[in-house]
UniProtKB/Swiss-Prot annotation:
Name of the protein in its database record: Inner membrane transporter YjeM
Record's keyword terms, sorted: Cell inner membrane, Cell membrane, Membrane, Transmembrane, Transmembrane helix, Transport
Keyword field contains Acetylation: no
Lipid bilayer topology: Multi-pass membrane protein
Length: 500
């Protein structure tokens, strides 16, 4: 008799989706870029991207629940191996860009924890500019993570848990402190409520506002992993759709509420119009403002209010540093494992698929470390201020993260056309509904990326930013095609490799 695995309840599923998708740092970024006008964009992205895409992934995950290759298997069985590999490689490469971005950003919370504010823009060593110093620290961080992770990731599981709990507590702090400030200030908001216009001078045009959609989509990132939870859920034919829709509503409300609450304590013009504020430190700037506003509402002295704000920023810095650390150790290994161990072995040179004594693909991990290091040095020594550096990396990560969604969405109609699959969970019962969902998701993701990429050129003639945003995804797409073509050539000469 087979061993019975305990299934997840509906509540457990909802919590799992919430923890996987919801990120504390997303609402501060949204408030900085768009103010209250970010809220309609977050709701729009949930309705036209998050919910339909999650349901599509749920269907594919249920039908391919016995496959070990994750999204590679889904696309391979639906469309074909070449399409699947390029799509999966883009998914993997988005995490390469994420590592390039985050290895630099991780020093912002560390600096905030030590000094009470972001001092990374003032770090100068041996004649190097701050951007270059942060770049070298990012390289050191990447090497350290690879050394530790290649010996097994079990040691950092506790840090990941602590970081996750700390960030969840930050959401609670934002809610309770904001309510307290509202009560003490007689319901007065620091920011005037306006859902139609952004207070940010850089986000006044229609083109710039449309490009913000990519930030909203990024906030819902990671939903492709939800499909893998179908077989672990009680009564998936009923509970899975309920769980996804309910979680999506809660997450949508949660993001919108968080953006709304930032306006309780922070006036955009007074606090965020400063040139030193950027997407890398906005979370800590807002948390410091939250603490200072609480101090003022409690009629503390200016010095005490400032001190309270600094401690809010420091606690946030520590929490975010722990969260980044846990995420970094996990994500430097998990996507690489999928692309190396989920795809045919003949795709890769033999050493890359070799596992060390700890069961880790250490050679591939060091090759990944080298690639990330090259990107870090290229960006950090390419000129520009620290503020532009962080903003550029964030945009690169957003574009790269959302491109793999196109591959998964485009594979969905092919998946629906197959007649030989056991489908325990079906939400799109007609060909028309499946096509509508596919078209809507593809259009939303495509337009978001196109608008984001062309906006710097159209508004400021800034070809540099546009080329950086395009460069990462294009490079990895070409690399994927080259790797797959090499695989085809090797299999043609040695057909037995195709079945390995």
């Amino acid at each position: 008799m087979p061993h019975t695995i305990k299934k997840m309840s509906l509540i457990g599923l909802i919590l799992m989706i919430f923890t996987s998708v919801f990120g504390f740092a997303n609402s501060p970024s949204a408030y900085y870029l768009m103010g209250y006008s970010a809220i309609p964009f977050y709701i729009f992205s949930a309705l036209l991207f998050f919910i339909p895409f999650a349901l599509m992934m749920a269907e594919m995950g249920a039908a391919y629940r016995k496959e070990e290759g994750g999204i590679y298997s889904w696309m391979n069985n639906s469309v074909g191996p070449r399409f699947a590999f390029i799509g999966t490689f883009m998914w993997f490469s988005s995490y390469i860009i994420w590592m390039v971005s985050t290895s630099a950003k991780v020093w912002v919370p560390f600096s905030t924890f030590l000094y009470g504010s972001d001092m990374t823009q003032h770090w100068r060593i041996a004649g190097l500019e701050p951007t270059q110093v942060v770049g070298l620290l990012a390289v050191a961080w990447m090497i350290l993570v690879t050394v530790v992770a290649s010996k097994g990731i079990n040691k950092i599981a506790r840090i990941t848990a602590v970081g996750g709990i700390a960030v969840m507590c930050l959401n609670l702090v934002l809610l309770l402190v904001s309510i307290t400030i509202l009560l003490l200030n007689g319901g007065h908001f620091a920011q005037d409520i306006n859902f139609l216009a952004s207070p940010n001078p850089g986000y006044q045009s229609g083109l710039a506002m449309l490009s913000f959609v990519v930030f909203a989509i990024f906030a819902y990132g990671g939903i492709e992993a939800v499909g893998g939870l179908v077989d672990k859920t009680e009564n998936p034919e009923k509970n899975f759709a309920k769980g996804i829709v309910f979680a999506a509503i809660v997450i949508s409300i949660g993001y919108s509420l968080a953006i709304f609450l930032w306006g309780v304590s922070t006036n955009w013009q007074q606090v965020l119009s400063n040139g030193s504020v950027n997407l890398g430190n906005i979370t800590y700037v807002l948390m410091k403002s939250l603490g200072m506003t609480l101090g003022n509402a409690l009629h503390l002295s200016p010095e005490a209010s400032l001190s309270l704000g600094v401690w809010f920023a420091r606690i946030t810095g520590l929490s975010m540093f722990l969260a980044y650390t846990g995420a970094f150790f996990t994500l430097c290994y998990s996507p690489l494992k999928a692309i190396i161990q989920g795809t045919p072995k003949a795709l890769w040179p033999e050493p890359m698929t070799r596992l060390n004594a700890m069961g880790m693909p250490s050679i591939a991990m060091w090759m990944q470390c080298g690639l990330v290091t090259v990107f870090i040095l290229l960006v950090s020594f390419g000129g520009g201020t620290a503020s532009a550096f962080f903003n550029k990396l964030t945009l690169m990560a957003n574009v790269s993260m959302t491109l793999p969604y196109l591959f998964l969405a485009l594979a969905f109609p092919f998946f629906k056309a197959r007649q030989d699959l056991d489908r325990p969970f079906v939400i799109f019962k007609t060909h028309l509904s499946a096509m509508i969902a596919t078209v809507v998701v593809v259009l939303v993701v495509t337009f978001a990326n196109v608008f984001t990429i062309i906006q710097p050129v159209v508004e400021a003639g800034d070809w540099d930013s546009t080329l950086w945003m395009i460069g990462g995804p294009v490079f990895f797409s070409l690399l994927a095609m080259a790797i797959y073509q090499n695989y085809c050539s090797r299999v043609a000469k040695n057909p037995q490799w195709a079945v390995e």
